[in-house]
């Protein structure tokens, strides 16, 4: 979760984070964040006190909390927790690591804890940690004036700097209301607000001026609870009236009442960026190859540019990256999902052009899509390349021969077009025999894509015939994915058939150009959208049809 603050104040050698309205002050103690409210003369209730941090769990029966509580009792440090029923925060580990020779006051300003207890470590990390561990329980980002408390802390080996993955059931993020502060902390905040000015309130600022927006960046909201001190429990309803400007805390009898907390948890929803444009009315790009070559030369550098160097902070969930950087990262992941080294086999740009990068293949694919008014992100790629023109070293080399760039584009265009036409032919194909026509086995990626395409077509053929159609289409796709010419693929797959429909389709598209608008053939290119969507969905990228 995230909490914004206005400025930092050093008071009694402790760093306080003061809210913009001046009604709340925060400070760290043992890895937990304490919040103190400004006392008001015209308010009959006490200033709200809160403690936000990680609560010990270790499992369903809270074995980690039970172990720490036993160790504290064994060492005579019962003062470190309030009661057996209350939650045990992570600051108890900080007290335990110092063997009780400290007070809460000495733990102030502590965001990172240490533990050398192997029994504690086994609940946090899946492997046995013989040496000590450091637990980064909170972060302060001064440039954003944001306090960040993670759902799971970063755990590091003290000696080897090895970073462990924290067990998911070790901690629970919790926001607790306190009935009072410990004595050492109560003395610390005495007179704190005397030197903190407050802005003049408007007539309608009674509620909003004191509200604290807690931005929840985890999957679920933080737990809420109330922590009572031991003397408060014995009084059975008596509670201490804390006056942060006084040395006394007197118990007074109060009636039961309800009160709204000023800490409002707000779920953070990451922005959804529109990657794919489906606007068929947009202007067509120029058929000139000069601009395409300029982008073709830049796109590899732009997609591989490490934008995280601009902000090396681990914390990026608060939107610290610009929209352009996030879009650039997403486009890089999409191109790798389709044409990357570890991606499944897919349509190529011809056997003589195997050295072009995945980003360049992706650019040519989007160029073909926008020419045929299909969903694409060509304009985004062009804007990114134009935006980073000044950061790319060197000048654009002499343009490659137009025929080379055109040949790559046409090769990819014809492969995509033949893929769609072959799908329609196989859907309408009725095999004369249920026997396998060949012993060749298609690749797993081609078989999966053939299944996807025929599922989209929703054929009602019996399962035995459907299996033959899937195998037939998979063999065709396998040839295309290996950059075999569509005519050669059609010749091989038409052997033994009583129709030359597949071969005729391959011959027809061999004379077509990607740079001419063929309205009749555009419908065949819808098949590639289904395959792209499947690959993006499996890779966790933004899909076209989402």
Swiss-Prot record:
Signal peptide (UniProt feature, chain positions): none
Pfam families: Herpes_UL21
One GO term describing the cellular component: host cell nucleus
Keyword terms: Host cytoplasm, Host nucleus, Virion, Virion tegument
Compartments in which it is found: Virion tegument; Host cytoplasm; Host nucleus
Top-level division of the source organism's lineage: Viruses
InterPro entries assigned: Herpes_UL21 (IPR004936)
Family: Belongs to the alphaherpesvirinae HHV-1 UL21 protein family.
Task performed by this protein: May facilitate the viral transport through neural circuits.
Name of the protein in question: Tegument protein UL21 homolog
Source organism per UniProt: Gallid herpesvirus 2 (strain Chicken/Md5/ATCC VR-987) (GaHV-2)
């Amino acid at each position: 979760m995230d909490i914004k603050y206005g400025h930092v104040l050093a008071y009694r050698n402790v760093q306080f984070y003061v809210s913009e309205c001046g009604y709340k002050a925060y400070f760290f103690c043992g890895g937990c964040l304490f919040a103190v409210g400004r006392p008001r003369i015209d308010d009959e209730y006490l200033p709200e006190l809160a403690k936000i941090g990680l609560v010990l769990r270790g499992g369903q029966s809270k074995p980690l909390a039970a172990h720490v509580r036993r160790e504290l009792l064994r060492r005579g440090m019962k003062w470190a927790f309030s009661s057996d029923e209350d939650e045990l925060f992570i600051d108890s580990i900080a007290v335990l690591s110092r063997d009780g020779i400290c007070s809460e006051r000495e733990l102030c300003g502590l965001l990172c804890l240490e533990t050398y207890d192997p029994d504690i470590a086994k609940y946090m990390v899946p492997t046995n940690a013989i040496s000590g561990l450091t637990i980064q329980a909170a972060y302060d980002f001064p440039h954003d004036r944001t306090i960040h408390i993670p759902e799971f802390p970063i755990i590091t080996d003290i000696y080897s700097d090895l970073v462990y993955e924290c067990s998911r059931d070790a901690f629970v993020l919790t926001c607790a209301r306190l009935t009072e502060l410990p004595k050492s902390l109560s003395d610390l905040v005495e007179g704190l607000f005397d030197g903190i000015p407050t802005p003049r309130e408007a007539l309608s600022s009674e509620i909003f001026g004191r509200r604290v927006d807690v931005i929840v960046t985890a999957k679920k909201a933080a737990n809420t609870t109330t922590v009572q001190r031991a003397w408060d429990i014995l009084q059975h309803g008596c509670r201490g009236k804390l006056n942060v400007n006084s040395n006394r805390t007197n118990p007074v009898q109060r009636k039961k009442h309800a009160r709204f907390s000023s800490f409002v948890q707000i779920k953070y929803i990451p922005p959804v960026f529109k990657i794919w444009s489906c606007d068929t009315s947009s202007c067509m790009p120029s058929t000139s190859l000069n601009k395409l070559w300029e982008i073709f030369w830049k796109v590899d550098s732009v997609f591989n540019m490490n934008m995280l160097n601009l902000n090396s902070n681990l914390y990026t969930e608060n939107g610290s990256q610009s929209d352009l950087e996030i879009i650039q990262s997403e486009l890089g992941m999409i191109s790798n999902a389709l044409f990357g080294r570890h991606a499944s086999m897919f349509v190529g740009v011809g056997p003589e052009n195997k050295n072009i990068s995945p980003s360049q293949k992706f650019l040519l694919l989007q160029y073909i899509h926008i020419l045929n008014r299909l969903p694409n992100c060509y304009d985004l790629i062009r804007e990114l390349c134009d935006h980073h023109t000044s950061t790319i070293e060197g000048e654009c080399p002499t343009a490659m021969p137009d025929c080379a760039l055109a040949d790559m584009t046409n090769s990819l265009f014809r492969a995509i077009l033949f893929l769609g036409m072959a799908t329609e032919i196989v859907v309408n194909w009725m095999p004369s025999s249920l026997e396998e026509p060949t012993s060749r086995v298609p690749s797993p990626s081609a078989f999966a894509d053939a299944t996807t395409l025929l599922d989209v077509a929703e054929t009602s053929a019996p399962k035995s015939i459907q299996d033959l159609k899937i195998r037939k289409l998979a063999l065709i796709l396998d040839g295309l994915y290996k950059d075999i010419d569509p005519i050669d693929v059609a010749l091989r797959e038409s052997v033994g058939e009583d129709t030359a429909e597949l071969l005729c389709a391959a011959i027809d598209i061999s004379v077509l150009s990607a740079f001419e608008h063929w309205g009749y053939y555009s419908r065949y290119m819808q098949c590639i959208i289904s395959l792209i969507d499947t690959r993006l969905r499996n890779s966790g990228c933004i899909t076209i049809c989402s």
